């Protein structure tokens, strides 16, 4: 088939990898997509030379503070990324797309926190540090013939996603009241991410990118919206706010009610609109 892009996704059963494959396969005349598991070493025998693009999403995605996990995080998130990129380059792949994360900038904050292009990454745990070291470990491989894209998305959500979103969605359907705290988060719906990656592939991009939804999200407004989609009523109250503010040192409180946003202009992409889902629609799609 003429002009078909051959794409290999590492991370066979990952939420993002599976979502991207389904997204691209809607246009089978443009994309051929394979996936490979990296859980054992058998992937090293795979011939990468048949692929134009490797999308590397294999990794440990959710933060652990268990020191016993630290070595594994570096082995999987850093070392595996570097070895995969080296293999891709040696075997003639033209573009390597790496899923990093906003986590390289550290945790959310009890006060407003806006990341701009001049913000220096300061990871606060070994998950963030392993991602940042992976970025740094593949930089030197870039050349005219081997383009590298690094994506640092914020929290990704969508139907079937993992992490904090489904926990909040469950709370929205069960709790009669929820704290109304003024916070702002950058988020990214899975369809917007997949469309963005498609543009990276189509335009043979290289560089560092910060895709996010058009709108910032206030946690209480998101929970209210989720409840409404399910026909539930939830009362937003500020009565718990003083107690919650004292608890911002606790990880889960900070993750749910903290502030962490990208400055909006960082996420624009050459006037091309990859944000095909606005926030309200994205919640309806996720919850239906």
Regions found by a protein language model. Name each.
Residues 82-126, 149:
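Conserved Rossmann-fold NAD(P)-dependent oxidoreductase catalytic core, especially the SDR/UDP-sugar
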Residues 66, 167-188, 192, 199, ...:
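A conserved pocket-lining segment of Rossmann-fold NAD(P)-dependent short-chain dehydrogenase/reductase
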Residues 75, 110-151, 155-156, 177:
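Catalytic helix-loop patch of NAD(P)-dependent Rossmann-fold dehydrogenases
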Residues 6-26:
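N-terminal Rossmann NAD(P)H-binding glycine-rich loop of SDR-like oxidoreductase domains
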Residues 74-81, 97-100, 130-131, 186:
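Short alpha-helix in the Rossmann-fold core of NAD(P)-dependent oxidoreductases
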Residues 132, 145, 156-167, 199-209, ...:
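Glycine/proline-rich active-site loop of Rossmann-fold NAD(P)-dependent oxidoreductases
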Residues 196-253, 277, 283-288:
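Mid/C-terminal beta-alpha module of Rossmann-like enzyme folds, strongest
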